[in-house]
Amino acid sequence: VAAVTIIMYIYYFFIAVYMGIAVAAAPIVSYNVGSGNYEKIKETTRYSFITIAISSVLILAISLLYGREIIHLFVGDGNVFHLTWDALKLFSPVFLFIGLNVFLSGYFTALGNGFISALISSLRSLILVVLFILILPKLLGVSGVWMTMPMAEAVTIFIAVYLYRAYGKSYIKETVRSS
């Protein structure tokens, strides 16, 4: 229980970065959809993608390079420390995927497409988590538990990017044309 709690504290600390990017971009996207400024939407999206990519690599590096020190903020040496460190190494790849998933969910909300936004959120935080928590521990033991969220986020990113390419850009173009 202690290891899960520590991992979740680290997770929620870092996810705040991605939430901030999504929350900051959403009103800019919404406003510019309404005003028909497609170029500003593209610019905001491009800057968001770049910021997410850089943040994701940095957060992954921090979690792996300084993970021990971060864990020591919560617990001293011992079994819990070693369990948490082993878990963090398996869990940390989540930081490569989660930023884009959170952003694209917020992006579709900003476009007024709540269905796709909810689909992305449901896949990454419920549907695929339940699916992988049922499958991965049977295949990989305890390691599968720690890999559940990274796997859910990794699969979701492919679906979210597909939805962005299929509906995100065309939705904006149609909305801007009809304005």
Which positions does each model-derived feature cover?
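Interfacial/gating helices of multi-pass transporter permease domains
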Residues: 1-12, 79-85
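Small-residue-rich hydrophobic transmembrane alpha-helices
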Residues: 4-61, 65-67, 98-120
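Small-residue-enriched core segments of transmembrane alpha-helices in multipass membrane transport
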Residues: 9-10, 89, 122-131
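Short, function-defining helix-loop hinge/capping sites that tune catalysis or transport
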Residues: 17, 107, 121, 129-133, ...
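A short pocket-lining beta-strand/turn micro-motif at the edge of beta-sheets
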Residues: 23, 114-116, 126, 132, ...
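Short alpha-helical transmembrane segments in multi-pass integral membrane proteins
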Residues: 29-94, 135-179
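Transmembrane alpha-helical segments of integral membrane proteins
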Residues: 102, 128-137
